[in-house]
Amino acid sequence: MAIRKFRPYTPGTRTRVVTDFSEVTGRKPEKTLVVSKHRKKGRNNRGVITCRHRGGGHKRLYRLVDFRRNKHGVTAKVAAIHYDPHRNARLALLFYSDGEKRYILAPAGVQVGQTVVSGPEVPIENGNAMPLSSVPLGSSVHCVELYAGRGGQMVRTAGASAQVMAKEGDYVALKLPSTEVRLVRRECYATLGEVGNSEVRNTSLGKAGRRRWLGRRPQVRGSVMNPCDHPHGGGEGRAPIGRSGPVTPWGKPALGLKTRKRNKPSNQYVLRKRRKTSKRSRGGRDS
């Protein structure tokens, strides 16, 4: 997989960088593995906006992805690599030996025709799923379960992987992509390798219209709003925000405020907190 750059024929193509989709082999999704999904557009059950800047976009069908990998001991053949409009990662279509078809997150390096399997005693190969107790130290894994049998909940985005650091008792220490080191039960399943399509981090949409196709609406700066709409609003001309630091539309500090509860029960499983992000990496956009 590689990225594709465009010549500046138009303002929209000047900075446009996209993936070349060379790894995608299937043109249409498997009919038995897609369902229609009502798009919430950032609203809750009362119609109130709870997540701003969502709405519109191209119509999609949701692909049913197998995050549990609970067909233990049944081999599956990778029939195709498909595009998924709901995530940056690609999907691998599996044909199991018993006739069942399932989608999984396509690991990096997995090719069409390759065989994958899940279970407690399976070969150490890319795409195979096994308990963390069976994964060798130093190996990279993705789609990691937090609770056994619930399905993979961590490390699922394109290009992501976690590293098995240590094993002690009933727990395995994982170094997550955020650099946080966390303990996970040894019976929880994970898939070997990293998620494919890692080059997506180097892409650029190039124009606002492509962002709208994805269902993302414009973000308006608080400083150009009225005082009734944002704490930064009001004033004559380009007035300063009038505060010691930027705040959210609800008056909370916008940069650097910790949102994790101090006495959260799962804190006992976090051996090392994630690295702190600088203001430059967070971006200084006026919320």
Curated annotation (Swiss-Prot):
Transmembrane segments: none annotated. One of the primary rRNA binding proteins. Required for association of the 30S and 50S subunits to form the 70S ribosome, for tRNA binding and peptide bond formation. It has been suggested to have peptidyltransferase activity; this is somewhat controversial. Makes several contacts with the 16S rRNA in the 70S ribosome. Part of the 50S ribosomal subunit. Forms a bridge to the 30S subunit in the 70S ribosome. Coiled coil: none annotated. It comes from Synechococcus sp. (strain CC9902). Belongs to the universal ribosomal protein uL2 family. Keywords: Ribonucleoprotein, Ribosomal protein, RNA-binding, rRNA-binding. The gene is rplB. It holds the Pfam family Ribosomal_L2. GO terms for molecular function: rRNA binding; structural constituent of ribosome; transferase activity. It comes from the Bacteria. GO terms for cellular component: large ribosomal subunit. PANTHER family: LARGE RIBOSOMAL SUBUNIT PROTEIN UL2M, RIBOSOMAL PROTEIN L2. One of its GO terms (biological process) is translation. Residues 221-287 are annotated as: Disordered. Residues 271-287 have a biased composition (Basic residues). This is Large ribosomal subunit protein uL2.
